Design a protein with these regions (language model features):
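Hydrophobic alpha-helical scaffolding
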Residues: 224-226, 247-251, 268-275, 311, ...
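Structural helix-adjacent loops and short alpha-helical linkers that scaffold large soluble proteins
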Residues: 272-279, 325-342, 389-406, 454-474, ...
């Protein structure tokens, strides 16, 4: 049953009986103190939340989405694995293992170097398990679960319940599956799993040495398993030089190392809001991002997280998208990967020569061969690097990398066309769609990068250069308006290139970098049916790259549009649309991450995190000792927090609350907080449940406003308040440390 409701001036759909009592679906708008529970979806999502925020996909035959596959990519520093269960995988005897790759074999960008356990090498991925002396196989799968680790849960079979936990080794060339066998009977069972060490493949690696890919089972010596007890063993796929000793498989040690990374994601840059969907998807997105370093000949570098494009970096994915976020996560490993990437670029420009030459846009494969050029890469690098260095507030690294910023600016100046915008052969789509001789993305990113680079230059005592950057940015802003500003398909917005007569998704970028003259109609265009694709019946949601009937969805444009909406002060619109997008991307077809289809690219997941940091909270470094906040607290929220954020070399807690409430969101009356309903306590504190059903607060479904309109912003360090200011939602708060 689906009811049409009117919510904040927008039509939304409410679907009854959306999930069972164990979970709350992410499509629920978890709202406190009378805010309606609504949903856009006409079908149940594939994934739902458990009470601790873990994602769960129950295999109960009720999945109505057209694409039944479950797949995603994860990796450690020296191994990458794709966890994949095809749509027709209903036979319990067919237990597919992960697809595994190792960077050491990646000679060329087109070299897939794909090892597929269970295909050609082994008939199944099922270890030889003996129960009471007889062969044992697991029963049908009952659920998938993701809490940082991916688990496959099985129904009991002959008194044994199996669970498989799949994850990569953080440090070793090893992909692991840890099997847990539990005795569900009231009597003892004898369990035995013979150990296995089998060579699957011998091949030359990038170092021209002979390497072995091995299938290993740690095994279980015959033992008696008492009722309720369990035993574990590991299945591993490993790669090693033939001359080296076999890798030591220590499942407990490997699991702890991986759990430590998951713990970092849970405790750093911690989002606390009344919305369980945002809290939990943000948490799991951080796990995916923290796993984005991989080994190359230059050392660890930040990569795209993809099965197809692993072992390399790109000016758009890793500089433009990822760099601004990395300092906030407080991960030394991630910073190391970003630093190594920029040092490769520094070395390249030193060797490549004159400032009128294009900068290499990507370095691909284990040996980091230079590939792309002419995509506006200089603007992408300028934007990402300047944001990264200013947020780090590290004088030494900023001085080291400043020449790369100058080199990018010099090239951009040399490539101004007669209209004063930047000429570029193509953009990040690399010719998939027309871009003319000059495109909006390149000039908009250059404008945004110049502004931040000028701030950075002043911190380094390079005031004359900083002044030049500011002047360049001012001139470029005027040229963007004159050259790209246009009426397109009825909207006063931007054309993407000179001959362009169709709306393009990248019209969000001027809004992202602070160009506001065409803000209102640009947002209208972005979320019109010409660009915004929303199909409740299939949970399909994305922004089209171009307003045609052809399939041109590009998920990164979706999150840039959402960032633009928040930055433009359209908080309710942005919040509504981001919930819809997350339901589709993280709880629907692509769950549990927002990675792009086919390539499993990490970029949308990173951009989602930036929608929160830059959009919802409006974090923007101003200098090495100051930053500004523009908190866009939704009208229906009493509070929001972003805790343990690493910013300007300090670990801070950012807390925003409605004036007249405490930091937990309780309304204050006569000096003391009024208690919330228990369901709302759960929604705020454990992040796994939404607030109470709307009928408890009246049947008219109106959004109540129980708090004052002013907000209180507090900045804390180690529990000590550094700053406290009040103002209106959307006000700019400058914080000096």
């Amino acid at each position: 049953m689906t009811l049409q409701l009117k919510y904040s001036g927008m039509n939304v759909l409410r679907h009854h009986n959306l999930c069972n009592s164990k979970c709350v679906s992410g499509i629920v708008l978890s709202l406190v103190l009378g805010w309606a529970m609504v949903s856009f979806a006409a079908v149940d999502p594939r994934w739902s939340f458990e009470s601790d925020g873990a994602l769960r996909c129950d295999l109960d035959g009720k999945d109505s989405l057209p694409d039944k596959r479950v797949e995603f990519v994860t990796h450690g520093k020296r191994v990458i694995m794709r966890i994949f269960f095809p749509a027709d995988d209903g036979n319990a005897m067919y237990v597919k293992g992960p697809e595994v790759q190792w960077p050491i074999f990646k000679r060329d960008v087109r070299d897939k170097s794909l090892i597929i356990p269970g295909k050609d090498t082994r008939s199944t991925d099922l270890p030889d398990i003996q129960v009471n002396g007889l062969p044992w196989v697991p029963s049908q799968r009952t659920a998938y679960r993701y809490d940082g680790f991916f688990q496959v849960l099985y129904a009991p079979q002959k008194g044994v319940r199996a669970t498989r936990t799949l994850f990569p080794s953080i440090e070793q060339r090893m992909a692991l599956q840890v099997w847990t066998l539990e005795n569900t009977l009231s009597e003892p069972l004898k369990i035995e799993v013979p150990p296995v060490q089998e060579t699957l493949l011998r091949r030359k690696a990038v170092d021209d040495k002979d390497w072995l890919v091995e299938y290993r089972v740690t095994g279980v010596a015959q033992q008696t398993l008492q009722p309720g007890d369990s035993v574990q063993f590991a299945v591993a796929y490993t790669a090693r030089a033939e001359a080296d000793s076999p890798l030591v498989i220590d499942p407990a040690r490997e699991k702890k190392a991986y759990a430590d990374l998951v713990g970092h994601a849970q405790s750093h840059l911690k989002l606390v809001t009344p919305d369980a969907l945002l809290n939990n998807t943000f948490k799991w997105a951080k796990v995916r991002i923290l796993l984005s370093n991989i080994e190359t000949k230059a050392g660890l570098i930040n990569t795209t997280g993809s099965m197809a494009y692993y072992c390399g970096f790109w000016a758009n994915d890793n500089a433009e998208y990822t760099s601004p976020l990395v300092p906030l996560l407080g991960s030394a490993d991630l910073e190391k990967g970003i630093d190594t990437m920029y040092r490769v670029w520094l070395k390249d420009i030193a060797e490549y020569g004159l400032k009128d030459k294009q900068i290499t846009g990507s370095f691909e494969s284990y040996n980091l061969k230079p590939y792309q050029r002419g995509r506006g890469d200089e603007a992408m690098i300028l934007y990402g690097l300047s944001h990264y260095l200013l947020a780090l507030a590290d004088q030494t690294r900023a001085e080291e990398m400043w020449p790369l910023i100058v080199r990018c600016v010099d090239y951009l100046k040399l490539n101004l066309n007669s209209a004063g915008v930047i000429a570029s052969r193509t953009d990040e789509l690399e010719g998939r769609l027309p871009t003319g001789q000059a495109n909006l993305s390149t000039s908009a990113l250059a404008y945004g990068g110049l502004q931040v680079a000028a701030r950075l230059g002043r911190q380094l005592g390079k005031t004359p250069q900083a002044d030049q950057f500011d002047q360049f940015a001012k001139s470029l802003a005027q040229s963007i308006e004159t050259f790209f500003g246009a009426k397109v398909q009825g909207y006063e917005t931007y054309r993407y290139y000179e001959e362009n007569d169709l709306l393009r998704g990248w019209i969000s970028l001027p809004l992202v970098v602070g160009l506001t003259s065409r803000q209102a109609e640009t947002l209208d265009a972005l979320f019109s049916d010409k660009l915004w694709l929303e199909k409740p019946e299939t949970l399909e949601v994305n922004l089209k790259a171009v307003s045609t009937e052809k399939r041109t969805q590009w998920a990164r444009e979706t999150y840039y549009a959402l960032l633009a909406a928040f930055k433009s002060g359209r908080t309710d619109l942005a919040l509504d649309k981001i919930r819809i997008a997350l339901t589709s991307h993280m709880l629907g077809h692509g769950g549990p991450f927002a990675d792009e289809d086919d390539s499993d690219l990490l970029s949308p997941t990173i951009l989602y995190a930036r929608v929160i940091t830059e959009g919802l909270f409006g974090i923007e470094p101003l200098s090495f000792r100051s930053f500004q906040l523009t908190p866009r607290l939704p009208d229906s929220w009493p509070m929001m927090q972003l805790n343990a954020i690493q910013l300007l070399g300090r670990q801070l807690d950012l807390q925003v609350s409605r004036k007249g409430s405490d930091m937990n969101g309780a309304k204050i009356s006569n000096g003391s907080p009024q208690s919330r309903p228990p369901a709302c306590e759960s929604g705020l504190k454990n992040g796994g449940r939404s607030c109470a059903e709307p009928q408890k607060y009246g049947s008219n479904m109106r959004m109540l406003a129980p708090f004052g309109s002013d907000i209180l912003v507090r900045v804390l360090e180690n529990g000590k308040e550094l700053k406290s200011q009040t103002g209106k939602p959307g006000s700019v708060f400058e914080i000096k440390l």
